[in-house]
């Protein structure tokens, strides 16, 4: 068998949206997150220069950088003694060492994962591209981390399963990944997320790894919806309004503490919306069921949006504007994630035409918003092995 170190490895992982339950999840309720058709793609090509070349065109001001592998090996606290099958956090001391090389958190994450998973024993040219806007709450960093981890583990034939038949495949085809290996990818990507976000929930990297959709509670963690969800069409719109997730979350918690008799019923209702959503997904079997599902989802979008904005107080005038525009054109919209700006999602109809979609996007654009069409319920991380052309 040809080693994967002699091949080009191309990996992609999806972004994510929160369908229902945002903010209620911090009050011990259920959130539903789904994988997006918008993905990050990472291509690993071996080189003979004893260097790590990173091409990251989507990261503003980064471009292409190249380092000698020896430069990393000489760093104090280099993660040489890490057991790859037992993911651990990047030490604060090694982060300080990486900061001497480059002062960008996202690149610290990449370099830690590269050093930990390869020990800098093989040189690569690595190119990262993404459909996902950075910093918009769509899981771009988790998609990035999962793609990096999956690719490096594959490149070095590192399998927690010992290399089961499911994980070993030939060239030119999409590789299968067993659940044990997916769990390893997920845990390593979480360590990368910690560098960028401190104490991430783990939702984003789980969605990017396993795909489809999952439920999440603070008490029980995440649970994958094994039946998946229907491939609903959505339009994601970026308000271009930055916000502090921490401040918004703290505001909801404060309201809950001050007015529990008012906020608790709201949280319970949002939890019921999540449950109704799952029940509707389970009742969907063919395209004939789409219209009924659409009606339910339209109602759930409207109700959840009103509760988030009016009762939790995480709305914003930009969100209200988008809700109003889309409603005038016959669509239903809710915020996704933290609110206070960020992104919103609009449910498209199964028969929404190209002209209708173009008109919707043009109207939003003329009001200063940027939007992307996507589907939800997409597959998780995928790996393709390609031979090097000689």
From Swiss-Prot:
Active-site annotation: 204 (proton acceptor)
Keyword hit for Ligase: no
EC number(s) given by UniProt: 2.7.1.36
Superkingdom of the source species: Eukaryota
Cofactor: Mg(2+)
Keyword tags: ATP-binding, Cytoplasm, Kinase, Lipid biosynthesis, Lipid metabolism, Magnesium, Metal-binding, Nucleotide-binding, Steroid biosynthesis, Steroid metabolism, Sterol biosynthesis, Sterol metabolism, Transferase
Main location: cytoplasm
Residues binding ATP, per UniProt: 16, 130, 135-141
Pfam families, per the entry: GHMP_kinases_C, GHMP_kinases_N
InterPro entries with a match to the protein in the record: GHMP_kinase_C_dom, GHMP_kinase_C_sf, GHMP_kinase_N_dom, GHMP_knse_ATP-bd_CS, Mev_gal_kin, Ribosomal_Su5_D2-typ_SF, Ribsml_uS5_D2-typ_fold_subgr
GO process annotations (BP): isopentenyl diphosphate biosynthetic process, mevalonate pathway; phosphorylation; sterol biosynthetic process
Class of the enzyme per the UniProt entry, highest EC level: transferase
GO cellular component, one term: cytosol
Single annotated GO MF: ATP binding
Residues given in the record as Mg(2+) binding sites: 141, 193
Compartments where found: Cytoplasm
Family: Belongs to the GHMP kinase family. Mevalonate kinase subfamily.
Function in brief: Catalyzes the phosphorylation of mevalonate to mevalonate 5-phosphate, a key step in isoprenoid biosynthesis.
Name of the featured protein: Mevalonate kinase
Gene behind the chain: mvk
């Amino acid at each position: 068998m040809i080693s994967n170190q002699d091949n080009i490895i191309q990996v992609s992982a999806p972004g994510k949206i929160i369908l229902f339950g945002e903010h209620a999840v911090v009050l011990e309720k259920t959130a539903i997150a789904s994988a997006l058709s918008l993905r990050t793609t990472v291509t690993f090509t071996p080189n003979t220069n004893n260097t790590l070349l990173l091409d990251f065109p989507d990261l503003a001001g980064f471009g292409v950088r190249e380092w000698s592998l020896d430069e990393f090996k000489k760093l104090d606290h280099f993660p040489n003694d890490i057991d790859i099958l037992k993911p651990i956090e990047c030490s604060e001391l090694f982060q300080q060492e990486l900061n001497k090389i480059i002062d960008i958190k996202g690149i610290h994450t990449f370099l830690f994962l590269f050093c930990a998973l390869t020990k800098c024993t093989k040189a690569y040219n690595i190119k990262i591209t993404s459909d996902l806007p950075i910093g918009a709450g769509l899981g771009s960093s988790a998609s990035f981390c999962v793609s990096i981890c999956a690719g490096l583990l594959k490149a070095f034939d590192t399998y927690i399963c010992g290399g089961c038949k499911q994980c070993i495949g030939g060239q030119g085809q999409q590789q299968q990944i067993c659940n044990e290996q997916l769990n390893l990818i997920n845990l390593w990507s979480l360590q990368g997320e910690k560098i960028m976000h401190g104490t991430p929930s783990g939702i984003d990297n789980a969605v990017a790894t396993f795909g489809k959709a999952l439920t999440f509670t603070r008490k029980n963690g995440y649970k994958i919806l094994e039946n998946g969800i229907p491939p609903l069409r959505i339009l994601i719109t970026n308000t271009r309004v930055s916000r502090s997730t921490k401040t918004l979350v703290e505001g909801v918690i404060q309201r809950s503490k001050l007015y529990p008799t008012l906020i608790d019923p709201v949280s319970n209702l949002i939890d019921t919306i999540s449950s109704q959503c799952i029940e509707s997904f389970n009742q969907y079997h063919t395209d004939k069921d789409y219209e009924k599902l659409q009606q339910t989802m339209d109602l759930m979008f409207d109700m959840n949006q009103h509760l988030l904005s009016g009762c939790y107080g995480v709305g914003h005038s930009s969100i209200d504007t988008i809700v109003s525009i889309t409603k005038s054109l016959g669509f239903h919209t809710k915020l996704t994630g933290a609110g206070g700006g960020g992104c919103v999602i609009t449910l498209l109809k199964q028969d929404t035409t190209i002209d209708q979609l173009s008109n919707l996007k043009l109207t939003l654009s003329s009001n200063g918003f940027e939007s992307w069409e996507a589907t939800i319920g997409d597959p998780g991380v995928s790996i393709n092995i390609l031979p090097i052309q000689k």
